[in-house]
Amino acid sequence: MNQVAVVIGGGQTLGAFLCHGLAAEGYRVAVVDIQSDKAANVAQEINAEYGESMAYGFGADATSEQSVLALSRGVDEIFGRVDLLVYSAGIAKAAFISDFQLGDFDRSLQVNLVGYFLCAREFSRLMIRDGIQGRIIQINSKSGKVGSKHNSGYSAAKFGGVGLTQSLALDLAEYGITVHSLMLGNLLKSPMFQSLLPQYATKLGIKPDQVEQYYIDKVPLKRGCDYQDVLNMLLFYASPKASYCTGQSINVTGGQVMF
């Protein structure tokens, strides 16, 4: 396989797991993270396991147009093509609406939505230039389908991501490029979720060590979403088997969201 995947937010947590999983399937991987040292470390791990030149680390700020333009040029110079873009960058801040700071709201929109737009715009250019019927996949959340209490900034951005995905799918269909959002359930063991335990405990009026079980009880399949669940869906929608699907918001929620 000579296919190249670009993973935004690939230097840590879920993004790093997806980079390793894509490399295991034969993709060459551009590991992109705002923390360039983390991107370089993941790329080094992949090269050590799967062979030299399988991965390269890039430092980039997805919310900066100039940074994304430079990233696109860098990926093009090193890999010469792009077949798959995965937008896995994201942040969340929980607060009651009257306490929610404008700066936090705006930052959520920038990272969760504007960065997705910039990366999709620039990397779809490369796909179109080379006649590649590529794939663009946004890592979204069930909060992009159902409002989330005390998470107005995050949920607003994720709802916006669904609209952007559908619009991109319509724009790019004539080039055979498909676009999807994966709507994840709670990644209970992820650093992002774990960092929010105290805020969620306060919101729910329970102890921090009770938060995970509270969310598990809401899921029909009675467990949280795992990184492997996300990778499984990503690999399918990136594959030729899903070539007739585009513009979809795919639930990976254990049945918690069914529309």
From Swiss-Prot:
It is an enzyme of class 1 (oxidoreductase). Its EC number is 1.1.1.140. Homotetramer. The active site is at Y154 (proton acceptor). It comes from the Bacteria. The keyword NAD applies. This is Sorbitol-6-phosphate 2-dehydrogenase. NAD(+) binds at residues 4-33. Substrate binds at S141. Keywords: NAD, Oxidoreductase. Pathway: Carbohydrate metabolism; D-sorbitol degradation; D-fructose 6-phosphate from D-sorbitol 6-phosphate: step 1/1. One of its GO terms (cellular component) is protein-containing complex. Gene3D superfamilies: NAD(P)-binding Rossmann-like Domain. Belongs to the short-chain dehydrogenases/reductases (SDR) family. NCBIfam families: PRK12384.1. One of its GO terms (biological process) is protein homotetramerization.
